[in-house]
Amino acid sequence: MSSGGLLLLLGLLTLWEGLTPVSSKDRPDFCELPDDRGPCRGIFHAFYYNPDQRQCLEFIYGGCYGNANNFKTIDECERTCAA
């Protein structure tokens, strides 16, 4: 196979991997954590994965501490946790 063909194949495989949803067995453990505002008093719109509803939901993050199930965008949450 030519180097151009190999590059095309590599590009297609990379695209496929990026578009394939996360399966529950590949989902990071922190996706199972509850939403956690944290102790600070800021008001930041953030997203967390809700395993019971199997979707990412918005919540208000206080700005500090909390846990790893905390994403700035719904897209980031869905790429990481949603199946």
Curated annotation (Swiss-Prot):
Species the sequence originates in: Tropidechis carinatus (Australian rough-scaled snake)
Family: Belongs to the venom Kunitz-type family.
Residue ranges of domain BPTI/Kunitz inhibitor in the record: 31-81
Protein's name in the database: Kunitz-type serine protease inhibitor carinatin-1
Keyword S-adenosyl-L-methionine belongs to the record: no
Cystine pairings recorded for this chain: C31-C81, C40-C64, C56-C77
Primary localisation category: secreted
Keywords noted in UniProt: Disulfide bond, Protease inhibitor, Secreted, Serine protease inhibitor, Signal, Toxin
Compartments, as annotated in UniProt: Secreted
Highest taxon above the source species: Eukaryota
InterPro entries, A to Z: Kunitz_BPTI, Kunitz_BPTI_sf, Prtase_inh_Kunz-CS, TFPI/VKTCI-like
Tissue: Expressed by the venom gland.
GO CC, alphabetical: extracellular space
Site (Reactive bond for trypsin): R41, G42
GO molecular function terms listed in the Swiss-Prot or TrEMBL record: serine-type endopeptidase inhibitor activity; toxin activity
Signal peptide: 1-24
One Pfam family cited in the UniProt record for this chain: Kunitz_BPTI
Function of the protein: Serine protease inhibitor.
